[in-house]
Each structure stands twice: as C-alpha cells, then as structure tokens.
Amino acid sequence: MKKARILLGAALATTLSFGFVSCSSSNDDNSGNNNQVTDENVVADDASALSLVNGVYSHWQPLSSSFSFIIELNSNKLISFEGEESEAGPVNSRFEQDPTTWYQVKIFNHLFLGIAQDNEAIATIENSLKAGKVSQAGYNAAVGKAKFLRALAYLKLTQLWGEVPVFTEKGGSTTDRKSIDEVFAQIVSDLTDAESLLKNYDGDPRVPSKQAAEALLARAYLVWGDNPLSAAEVEAIANGQADPQFSKTDSRLEKAVEYANKVIASGLLKLDPEYNKLWGRDYESNKRGTNEHLFTIAHDGDKVDAQGNHQTHCSWTFPFQNGEYGNGYTQNHTEVADDNLYDDWKAEQPNDKRLAETYFVEIKNPEDGKTYHYYSPVYTPINGKGVDQSYENSENLEITKNSVDRIEIRYAEVLLIKAEALVQLGRNSEAAEPFNQLRRRAGIAEVSAPTFDQIKREWDYEFTYEQFSVLNSYRWKDLISSVKLVKNYKHFADDWKTSLGNTYTADQEAYFTKVHNHLRAKYNNVRGKHYRQPIPTGLSGEDLGIAQNPGY
C-alpha cells in the first residue's frame, strides 16, 4: 500500500546528497583525503559497524509490498483496485505506467538510496578496521551484509530496469547506465565477497548468511543465463505485441547449478513439511525451526518500521467485506485477476496441497464462525499467502499491524533454480530430484524428467504472489503471450454479464465490471516496452539525469 510520499523526509534528502555525491565524485576538493582515517569517518566498535549497515533496511522495509505492485500487477495474475483508477496500483495493473508512477519512483529511488548507504557504510567500516576500532570478525559481518544487500538491490534494479548506473564505495557514476553484463559482474563480485565474509546459516534468516549469498548467486546466474534483453533489443520490439526470441548462455546456467548445489550440500536448509505454515506472523523467519526461510526482511509493523509489510494489507484490505451476511462490500487493494487462475490449477492438479494456501475461495471468520465465499458471482479468489492464519483471529488483526517479515529467499527456490537450470541445459533427468522434492511436499505426481513447460508451471504452483511473475516472464521472453492469456478468463468477454449464467448484486456487478476493464486493458496495452520499467523521477519529482528506457 502507498504511504505518504514524505516517507523518510529529510533523512532521504541527506542520504541522497551524502551517498550519491560522495560515491560519484572522484575529483572534488576532498578527493585527496579519501584514504585518510580520521575520527569523523570511523565507527567505535563492531556493534556500531553492524548498526551502520542495518540502517540500510530503512530503504528495504518500504518496498516489501511495493514490489508486488510492479512484479505481480504486470502479469496475468493480479489486478489492483487501490484507490481511484488513476492511482499507481490500477495504473500498473493496466500497463499504463510512466516515469511518474509512484511504485516505480519509490522502488527505484529507495534501492539506489540503499546502495548509497551501503557504499558509505563499507568505506567507513574499512577505515575503522584500519584504525583498529573494528575487529576482523566485526568487519566480516558488517561488510558482508552490506555487500549482500547491495548486490540484491542491483539485481532487482537490473531485472526491472535493465542497464542501470553502477557506483560503489570506490566510485562510479549515478547517471551513466552500464551494460547488463557490467551490472551482473558487480552483483557477482559483491555476492562472492559476501559468501566469503558471512557465517553459515544459523536458523535466523533475518541475518544474511553464506548460504543466502550462494542462493542469490544461483538466482543471479539463472537470470543472467537467460540473456536479459539489451536496450537495443527492447527498442526493436517496444511498440509491438510480439515477444522476442528466448536465448540462453549455458556457462552461466552451469554456475546457477553450482551455487544451488553449494546451498544444498551445506545440509543446513530443508523444506518445511507444512507448506501452509510458511506465511504469517507466528510462522515468520523460521520461528518453527524448519529451516526453509533463507533470507527475510524483518518487520515489526507500521508504528516501528520505516514501513510495515503491507503484503497482507493489500491482498486482504477489508476482511470479510464481500457483501455476505449483511456485511458491506469493499474492494481490496490487490485482487486475483479472475476465477480461472484457481480453476485451471484445480483442473491440472486437483490434489496439490499448495492450491488451498495460494487461492482462498472460502474463508471462515473466527469472529462470527461463518464461512465467506470468494468466487464469482460474489468475488474473485483471495491471495491466501496474504491472509495471516498463524495466531488467534489473525485473519482480522494482522492487517492492522503489517508486521509479518517478508520472505526474499526460501530453500524451495534453490531447488527449483537447480531444476530449471538443468532442464535448460538439456539434463532433464538430473532435474527430477530437486523438482520432485517440491512435488512430494505438495502431494502430486513425481516425474522422471521434467520438461521446461513443467518447470515454468511449477514456479506458479510454488511461488504465486511471491514477487516472481513478471521477472520470470522477462527471463522466458513470454511477457506478452502470458499476459494475453487473460482473453480466456471468465470476465474478459464483453457479454460476461449474461453469458456466465450468474446474477449479480449492484456491488458485485460494479466489482466484476472493473475486473473486466482491467483484463481488457492488460490485453490491449501490453507492449514490448514493458520488458523494462520506465526510468522514474526522483522522490520529489526531479529528473534523475538517467537516459529513459525505450518506448517511454
């Protein structure tokens, strides 16, 4: 959900001027002092070093739900009725984003502000080590975390915006866009350093670990291995509705397998036997000790965080207000695009345990004991991972707290990365072992050699609403064709009011009219340019001086 645009106010402006300028200016009047250690550019001890890096989370916490407003809305799976139709959520849902669209502005700027803060922290802690203020162990923990977070930020940025500026504590430009390969080289460098600096996973996923760095390396190499489009390639398709050709680089896919194997071989991670207990406040960040959560962003709620995690708030904004039992009818901020997403899965895999957690078609209200239905003609299904069911009456209470930690990486992703990379390399039978681990937990049939199509569908089964949708479409080069699947949805046809055999209340008709309009807009508006997001303005609307992406 969108918060007030003040966000961090003066703190953001201070970080912007401090971080961006100092990292991009190598010839200013102070450049001769860059290697001098003074009382002003050191921290006092190990705890202070770690605290300095932890300040970067003020730029990650506001993004936990915001990522969904690009990554999930720019797909066939999710639509948004957050506020007026001119607001940023509905705009992204309809593929009408531009450089001023708030979620693009917010994510892009916060990621770069976090990078600037990482850079300053690394430089300061390096000075502190030289000055004897910080131990080697303290340096490893703090700088390892800073490089981990910087790499994650650059990975998000290049996946969504392509070529982006690269600047570190050693210098660089905040406006000149680097090639895709140069951005990934920086990501790999940071994560390789983090892998060597960080300790092994100890059951607390809020702390980046050696295995979390290896998992991100596996993710990065899979993304890089699927040959992200260059600006020139996007330019060639920007105004059309044809997907580009899929291509890959096998050497990078081999590295994805290598790093996934490192995580697996550590023996420190495993799948939680109960899929439905991966989400919720009382299940967050490995509280059950099952060791599937590998890296999470900690949240304590809106009153404590820079911003709480609104993944629950946005998918379940108004609990049980679907018009039944005399209750009001109010639309959530994000909605499952149509019944078909539930129906198709149920037809394909009726025994998949994950379906009941992913799409709720009915929910019992613990306050009145009644069961509420989320299926046409009443409503569309609810994203179940956004409905906290981990503590007493959490279905009604958690949206007032927004305190659930966000999962960035879990062990299931490592297994599926390995399986997919092996399939892309033509080693399908080897992919069966990691692939079937997910299927065994889900209670569905195992396969001897998964196909690429089965791999793609498994990403849906396992990770719906976990901020992968458009990123996978970018990798597989099927953004346009996947979005155009909405033409098969119940409420896409203009005669939906009469052809489906339903009768609707006024509230229901208004809701499904908006569903219809958003499905139509997705189908009509998606273009090749949407393989990139628009380079946005700054948080105050200023021009950032970065060349715009094709088509915007």
Regions from the PLM with identified roles:
Residues 158-160, 165, 202, 223-232, ...:
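Short coil/turn linking the two alpha-helices of tandem helical-hairpin repeats
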Residues 41-48, 53, 57, 61-64, ...:
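Elongated scaffold/linker segments in the mid-to-C-terminal portions of large proteins
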Residues 3-4, 13-47, 151, 187, ...:
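Bacterial Sec-dependent N-terminal signal peptides
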Residues 67-84, 199-215, 226-318, 444-456, ...:
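Short, surface-exposed recognition loops and adjoining beta-strand edges that mediate ligand/DNA contacts
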Residues 41-64, 85-161, 171-185, 189-205, ...:
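Conserved, well-structured interaction surfaces
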